Structure formats: C-alpha cells, structure tokens
Amino acid sequence: MKKTNPVKTRAWLFLEKHYEDIKNRHMRDFFKEDPRRFDNFSLALDDILVDFSKNRITTKTLELLLNLAHEAGLKEMINSMFSGEHINETENRAVLHTALRRQGDEPVLADGKDVMPDVRAVLEQMRVFSGRIITGEWKGFTGKAITDVVNIGIGGSDLGPVMVTECLKPYAKPHMNVHFVSNVDGTHIAETLKLLNPETTLFMIASKTFTTQETMTNAYTARAWFLEKAGDKKHVARHFVALSTNKEAVEEFGIDSQNMFEFWDWVGGRYSLWSAIGLSIACYVGFENFHELLKGAYAMDVHFQKEPFERNIPVILALIGIWYNNFFNAQTEAILPYDQYMHRFPAYFQQGNMESNGKSVDRDGNPVTWQTGPIIWGEPGTNGQHAFYQLIHQGTKMIPADFLAPAQSHNPIGEHHKILLSNFFAQTEALMNGKTAAEVQKELEAAGKLPEEIAEILPHKVFDGNRPTNSILFKKLTPRTLGSLIAMYEHKIFVQGALWNIYSFDQWGVELGKQLAKKILPELEDERPVNSHDASTNGLINAFKHMMG
C-alpha cells in the first residue's frame, strides 16, 4: 500500500487552514444558508439512509477531505485489499474477509490461488450441518435432538457471533437456543453450564490454532462437564465441533475432523463472523438468513469498491471521523443504536475500530505525530439518554455520535416504536440546535419565573448545540440490512487506517500481556513470595497469594 504521511500532504495543510476558518461556525447557520442541506448531505444504499447533514462541515470541507483521500492514494489501497495483496505487511498476509461474502463466480486470488472454491466448500459444509442441527436430524448421544448451541471463543471468535445473534433474534428458529462463553473467568462457563442439558447441547470450539488459552481452558471444562454425564469419550464427537485449522489437535480433543470447519490466515479475527466462525449464527437463525447477511455485506462491498468517493458512504463517514479526530481533537466516537436488538453493536465495533486503528507507529515504522484511532463506545437508546447523554449535550468534550434506528420494529407494540423514534429524531435535533440564552429566558418568563430566579438558573439551562451526529435510518433490521451496516463500519475503519498511514490488520499490542501472563501463571502455583517483577506487580501477586491462604 502507498505510504503517505498525511500531515505532509497539501490537502492536510489546506484542511488546517479551513479548520481555523470554520471552527467557530454553528450548524444552525449552515441549515439557514442551505435549505437543501439534507438532500446535499445524505446518501442511501438499498434500505439504508445516511444523513450526515448535522455535522460541522461545508461543501468546502468535504472537497478538502476528498482531496486528502485522493492525494493519499485511497482508491489504489482499496483495490489492493480486494485484489488480495498482502496489505497486512507486518504478518505478511492478504486481507480478504470480503471474499467470504462475495456473490458470483469471479475468482479472488490470494498468493496466486483462487480462494473462492474453498470458501464455497466451507459455506456448503455450514449449510448442510446447520440444516441437520435445526431439523433435528443430528442426534446427541442419547438420541435426542440438539436444542442448545454453545460457542466457545474469544475476541473475534465471540464478539461477532454474539452481536449478530442478538441483532437477529427475531429470526431465531423457535426450538434453538444459543449461548456464548468467552471469558477465562470460571464464572462464565459455570453459569452457562447451569442452563444446559448435556444430552441436547452442542459445543462449538472456535480457535484457529486450537491453542488459544482462554478458549481451550473453557473447552476442556465443557468437555469434563459433558463426560461426567455421558461417560464414554466416543460421545464427544456428537456434542463438539471445531472452527479451526489444526486437524491433529482437534482429533486429539475427540472431535471428528469431518466436523472441523476451516478458515484461513487471510481472515482476521475481528472480521471472521462471515467465515466458519459464523456457524453458531447459521444454526440459530438458519443458513438462509446467514446467506442474506453475506449478501447485505457484499452489497456494501460493491458500493465501497465502485462508487465515487463523494457518493461513497464508508468513505464519507471515515473522512468526517478524521475531521473531528485530527482537527477538532475529538477523542471518542459514540455508536448509539435505537434498537434493543443492537445492544452489542457498539461493543463489536469497539473491538473492530480500537484493535484495528489503535496504533502509534506508521507503515514505515516511525512514531506518528498525528492522532489515530478514537475510543469507541455506546449503548442503546433511550437508555443512554438517562445515563451519559448529559455529557454529550453540555460537557466540555466533543463526542461525535452515530445514531442508528429502524423505521419498522419487529415488535410493533402500542406506541413504543413511535416514542422511541421521536427520541431518536429529537436527540440529534437538540444536539445540533441547542438552546440559546434568549430561548431559555423566554421559556422561563412564560413559566412565570421572577427576574432574579431567571438570572440564577438561566446559564445552567443553555445548550450550545453544535454537537455533531450522523443519523443512519434503515427500513427494518433484517439479516441483509445488518450485513450492510457491519460492512459499512468495516470499510470506514479501513479508510481511516489507510489515510492515517497505519496497519489496521495486526494487533501486536495484545501479545505482550499474553506473554507475561504465561510467565506469571507458574508463579501463582508456587507458595513462595515473588520478587521477579517491578515492586507493584510483586506486591499484587504476593497480596493475592496471602488472600488465597
């Protein structure tokens, strides 16, 4: 990929000057000056409408941001990803999660080999297997059908399937339950096992290498629990499958290698829900809905690859994010879905964004002198309104926020959905407009307040407004729409990493803690005091040993 220091581009210099010109302007004025601002600052793809008009941008801002994308060679970098070049250079890998959802017969090459036959073969394996689980054809060791699927994984092997199965609960097969165990804290597996019957439970062990410490610790605990009831180790093969590539370790565990679902090193963990890692999704909502998820993502892939940048949803969202991150010095972004089914959506992209773009070294190995990935967080509306929106409205920090909502609810009970959506629309309007001192004064006078009372309370009721938001409105939360939304954010993250000149597809920062944990674990088995670390770590370990007795 092209390596361009963004702050040394002509576009960046123009953006710095433009920021000085625009930083104190209010969005209220932008709307007054342009009655067609909504039309000019919104884009659509299928059933998804993205309104970015409530941002502190003008046509000039977008023009300069688009110049940055062109000057940095973004088009070429997009093509490099889709064509299978090794853009994950620190691990010498292609980045081809987009191949997993590709529709059609065109080849996709990785290291000169068309990966699509293997992708289709695993998808067919998933289709057949999930069908056998759902229809009850697959029997447990006592001849009973499977009712509960437990996915044991961590990170990308957990967060994606958790988020998607929560989002797609309305599509769940009526007799299927799905559970997820990720944390190595024994509480997670213990509380999950309490809910299960070993005769009707299927465990999916999601680990590419079949050596991931947290996952395999939980897997062996699950196997021991199962064998307490089943007795014979031969029954493991009816109740455990593997999402892995380590055939030898899978068979040693007791899993039939015919029930090993493969994925490849060009699939990053946080982009793996589209692969065999999505088997729990297919078993929960049916392969036909998993396929719709893939088709929705593919539609966004085509849009991202083909549309001009000025009409390209992921590109525009990424550029607006850079505008706030690098020029307004915003530290965080909020993702606020007004749909309870999407309650894990912010957490999923917390990993997707922060693990991808939480980097401080550029693609040449030099320390960056510009801000990179933001902190991502969020909760569903309207809960967040009664928790943290106060700071977004009146705090000292700028927090750009994405508001997402479906026009149609899966649960159209009474007035619930209209009340929910009235809050969705009201919040972005309030964040944009705010409330001036004159408006507050008029309101208080109408309420019969005395002048001295007004003087005392007025400053506290003023909202500056000018708080930026994107509104993402879609017809209904279907598998296809969800696939498009996920791919939209994936590509936004890619664009930002590309323009910041960092590697978005490795995660070396995760490794050091893992290495140290392996050194510390044997020390916790020994009763002797520890003195091999810094004073704080020694003190904490020794205090732990004392508390353990």
Curated annotation (Swiss-Prot):
Pathway the protein acts in: Carbohydrate biosynthesis; gluconeogenesis; Carbohydrate degradation; glycolysis; D-glyceraldehyde 3-phosphate and glycerone phosphate from D-glucose: step 2/4
Matching InterPro entries: G6P_Isomerase, G6P_Isomerase_C, Phosphoglucose_isomerase_CS, SIS_dom_sf, SIS_PGI_1, SIS_PGI_2
Function of the protein: Catalyzes the reversible isomerization of glucose-6-phosphate to fructose-6-phosphate.
Residue numbers annotated as active site: 355, 386, 514
The entry's keywords: Cytoplasm, Gluconeogenesis, Glycolysis, Isomerase
Location in or out of the cell: Cytoplasm
Transmembrane segments: none
Gene3D superfamilies: 1.10.1390.10, Glucose-6-phosphate isomerase like protein, domain 1 (3.40.50.10490)
EC number: 5.3.1.9
Broadest EC class assigned to this enzyme: isomerase
Family, per entry: Belongs to the GPI family.
HAMAP family (alphabetical): G6P_isomerase
Pfam families in the cross-refs: PGI (PF00342)
This protein's record includes keyword Cytoplasm: yes
Protein name: Glucose-6-phosphate isomerase
Species classification: Bacteria, Pseudomonadati, Thermodesulfobacteriota, Desulfobacteria, Desulfobacterales
One annotated Gene Ontology cellular component of this protein: cytosol
One Gene Ontology MF term: glucose-6-phosphate isomerase activity
Species whose genome carries this gene: Desulfatibacillum aliphaticivorans
Keyword Cytoplasm set for record: yes
Coiled-coil parts of chain: none
Catalytic activity of the protein: alpha-D-glucose 6-phosphate = beta-D-fructose 6-phosphate
GO biological process: gluconeogenesis; glucose 6-phosphate metabolic process; glycolytic process
